[in-house]
Amino acid sequence: MIRRLLPRTLRARLTALIILSTAATLALSGVALYSALHNRLVGMSSYEMSATLAAMRTHLANVANVDDIPRKSDLWIDQLHGHQNLDLAIYDTDGRLRFATRGFVAPRPALGAPQTRVPASAAPAGATFSYLADDAPLRGGNPRTARIVVQYDGKNDHALLRAYAYTVVVIEVLAVVLTAALAYGIAMLGLSPLRRLVARAEQMSSSRLAQPLPELDTSGELKEMEHAFNAMLKRLDESFVRLSQFSSNLAHDMRTPLTNLLAEAQVALSKPRTADEYRDVIESSIDEYQRLSRMIEDMLFLARSDNAQSHLAIRTLDAAAQAERVAGYYEPMAEDADVRIVVRGKAEVRADALLYHRALSNLISNALNHAPRGSTITIECAQAADAATISVSDTGRGIEAPHRERIFERFYRVDPARHNSASGTGLGLAIVRSIMENHGGTCGVDSEPHVRTTFWLKFPAHAA
């Protein structure tokens, strides 16, 4: 409800909130101060009446009987010296008035009745007077008590409270008006770095993403927002660069088989051919078609993975047994390349079986492409408390450090000379990374050139 009432702009909202909080604080302060002053005045009036009543009781104790009360009027008047708001009266036990000062106004009859306990007080509704009454013993005579009634005129106190309330209201209204002006200026000043940030952001374009926003002369939340915005620009720039490289590599990789297909078709049609020659052309074209098909399938898989559209059938797998199964698919290729594939260790992974096979298959295929003849490809399964690690190692020429960070990027190849190789699409390792991200795991590579290269997959104990 409050959000709907607040202005939409941040500047107006800050101004309104400052005004509202200031007005509420001033109002509460004014009420508290008014209450404190009122209580103070009530306390002072009660003290004056009680003190005067006590003094009157002391003096009446020396009076012989009620008939002597009117004769000592000067004494009773002296008790009010310095108490300009007080008046008093003395009654006998029959309720007859024996003495009263000039400003005394007769109270309700109950105050004139005899009292046996604590002093009685009263404040008639709508009147400014308040009363305190009590019985006082006399020295002798009959009756032996007299009734004292002390009157306090609160007219001056009420006038003071009204003037104070009026002054407080005027001051608070002026303070709110001044606060509104100051709040607007403070909001404008406080949001000036944000306006500069907005102006700079409006100038951004895809060609200027690499240029960070200027440093703001501020700290705190705006500084954090500036850093977050610059970090976002950096990520966007990196994404645009990768997208540009991806588009370039994709165009180049698709152009090669299309060029081959076109060239073969043109050569085949340049003159009459025998059936065997046409068969050779068609078989060669099929290889290029298959390469294009694999590339498109890999790209579709990555697109589905990036958009989280693939459904994972997560279950517990025997990592070593599944690795043996995948390695069996590559035994014929390994025999042709004179390479052995060995599976070691034991571990359990929480993964989608098909995707686990595909990730491991891509790593084994990659290792076969680089393993020297007569060498061994080792698949190692290791179990830890928080994760299971599956690694594929070969003893090929290895990967230099500058290439390791980018080896899992799409279409990235360490050896440009192999760029047009028909052995792969350049998306195998990118697919591996996508599969691991979908499982909440990680992948990486450790390589010592010309000694050993190990690609590893780390599956968390509880898959995402």
UniProtKB/Swiss-Prot annotation:
It is found in: Cell inner membrane. Residues 188-241 form the HAMP domain. It catalyses: ATP + protein L-histidine = ADP + protein N-phospho-L-histidine. Its main location: membrane. The keyword Signal does not apply. Residues 1-13, 188-464 are periplasmic. One of its GO terms (molecular function) is ATP binding. The chain crosses the membrane at residues 14-34, 167-187. It comes from the Bacteria. Residues 249-463 form the Histidine kinase domain. GO terms for cellular component: plasma membrane. Keywords: ATP-binding, Cadmium, Cell inner membrane, Cell membrane, Kinase, Membrane, Nucleotide-binding, Phosphoprotein, Transferase, Transmembrane, Transmembrane helix, Two-component regulatory system, Zinc. Its EC number is 2.7.13.3. It is a multi-pass membrane protein. The modification Phosphohistidine is found at residue 252. The keyword Phosphoprotein applies. Residues 35-166 are cytoplasmic. Member of the two-component regulatory system IrlR/IrlS. May be involved in invasion of eukaryotic cells and heavy-metal resistance. Probably activates IrlR by phosphorylation. NCBIfam families: cztS_silS_copS. This is Sensor protein IrlS. It comes from Burkholderia pseudomallei (strain K96243).
